[in-house]
Amino acid sequence: MSSPKTPQEITVLQLYPRDMNIYGDHGNLQVIIRRLEWYGYTPKVIHYNVGDTLPKNVDIVIGGGGQDSGQEKIHADLLKIGPKLHGWADEGIPMLMVCGLYQLFGHFFKTLNNTVLEGIGILDVETFGTNERLIGNIVTQSDKFGEIIGYENHSGQTFLGEKATPFATVIKGAGNNSKDGHEGAIYKNVIGTYLHGSILPKNPAVADFLIKTAAKRKYGSFSHDLIDDMFADMARHIAIERPR
């Protein structure tokens, strides 16, 4: 497998792993680390929790899901660092936000008890808490990534605004809500999604998008041999065949 001649560092920032990492989303970080290493890069991982100092420069940003209580814990801090995250998003830094952080990257999340958590507005989406839980295996189709699979488990229902582009279209499952057939949202290189499982182990094309985008932004190019994703493909096949 070809790789950069000299080790090149890629900095990966994980947002709020202490409070927003209860559905196995840490697996996304593990996939990015391993694939960076396979491609010959040196991953530098920074864990950011409430009250920490945000680094000046990053190459990839990821964040996971949590309970409503977890969102409330991080909310004020997220609003504080929101302008910096906005700037990074506008610059084209690749990001992956899952479930709870996907919701807070939108305009707001209105909980079932009518508490409104203001979002940072990177994604043109709005989320409303409901009594209906959307749970089960999900299969979607993306123009950019092909078939994307995962597991959804959320009671918040998210609706896209006019400026939002869906991450994928639902083939089996619910997606953002129980009405329109959209899953997730994209702004530039920022992806928001409800797919757990974790999403990246079974969808290496999405992981490689984050890595390739980061490498090209930082070093101007991305050249490598293909990784043998045989086991990921096997997992995908099994997951696709599972009932809802």
Where in the sequence are the language-model features?
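Cysteine-nucleophile active-site neighborhood
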Residues: 67-144
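Beta-strand-turn-beta hairpins that frame and shape the catalytic cleft
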Residues: 8-10, 143-148, 186-191
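A glycine-centered loop/beta-turn motif at secondary-structure junctions
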Residues: 177-215
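Glycine-rich beta-alpha junction loops
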Residues: 16-18, 155-157, 197-199
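Conserved beta-strand scaffold positions in the cores of enzyme catalytic domains, especially
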Residues: 14, 45, 122, 150-152, ...
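Pocket-forming structural segment of enzyme catalytic cores
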Residues: 112-183
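N-terminal beta1-alpha1 cap of cysteine-dependent amidohydrolase-like domains
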Residues: 1-87, 201-244
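Structural motif
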Residues: 60-64, 96, 192-194
